[in-house]
């Protein structure tokens, strides 16, 4: 099983580090699992250096899409175009997205349109404030996600209120 893990901003790397550690552990135990780490470059951060990845004990990203800043539409379109080109080179079984940044939504849409399962870490979180771009990212991502890793009972209830069955919530 190949899992493509998406990170768009510095906090995403901290959230995916334990997931990467577990995948590496499972692979070392002979399980047929591997991952590809893609950084969209949505939030440029000069602190994302080799030292940062060493501290988290994760490898540097396999790919940096280098999207950078721009309007919401420019970022979304740029991420979708670059991610689709990259993912078609080695189609994974699962695309794992994190949080509520534009990269989360854009990569989830691309994966779903290619019939690839989507896992959303921090699914179900809501502010109910549609003036926040992050809330729109969360809602769109959750609408097309196959499996949700949640952080609270409130998130579970939000997903259930949207008709998501228990067997898709972890």
Give the residues covered by each predicted segment.
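An aromatic- and histidine-rich active-site surface loop
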Residues: 96-114
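Conserved nucleotide-sugar phosphate-binding/catalytic loop shared by glycosyltransferases and other
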Residues: 33-75, 82
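Active-site-proximal region of nucleotide-activated glycan assembly enzymes
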Residues: 116-170
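Helix N-cap/beta->alpha junction signal
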Residues: 9, 99-101, 152-154
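Structural motif
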Residues: 2, 93-94
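N-terminal subdomain of nucleotide-sugar transferases
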Residues: 1-40
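Short, well-structured alpha-helical segments in soluble
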Residues: 80-91
């Amino acid at each position: 099983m190949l899992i493509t893990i998406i990170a768009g901003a510095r906090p995403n790397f901290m959230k995916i580090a334990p997931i990467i550690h577990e995948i590496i552990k499972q692979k070392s135990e002979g399980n047929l699992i591997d991952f590809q780490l893609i950084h969209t470059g949505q939030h440029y951060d000069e602190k994302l250096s080799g030292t940062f990845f060493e501290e988290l004990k994760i490898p540097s990203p396999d790919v940096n899409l280098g999207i950078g800043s721009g309007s919401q539409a420019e970022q979304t379109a740029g991420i979708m175009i670059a991610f689709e080109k990259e993912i078609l080179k080695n189609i994974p079984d699962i695309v794992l997205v994190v949080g509520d940044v534009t990269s989360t939504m854009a990569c989830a849409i691309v994966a779903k349109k290619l019939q690839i399962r989507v896992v959303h870490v921090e699914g179900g979180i809501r502010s109910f404030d549609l003036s926040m771009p992050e809330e729109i990212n969360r809602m769109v991502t959750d609408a097309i996600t196959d499996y949700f890793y949640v952080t609270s009972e409130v998130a579970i209830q939000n997903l259930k209120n949207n008709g998501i069955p228990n067997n898709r919530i972890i």
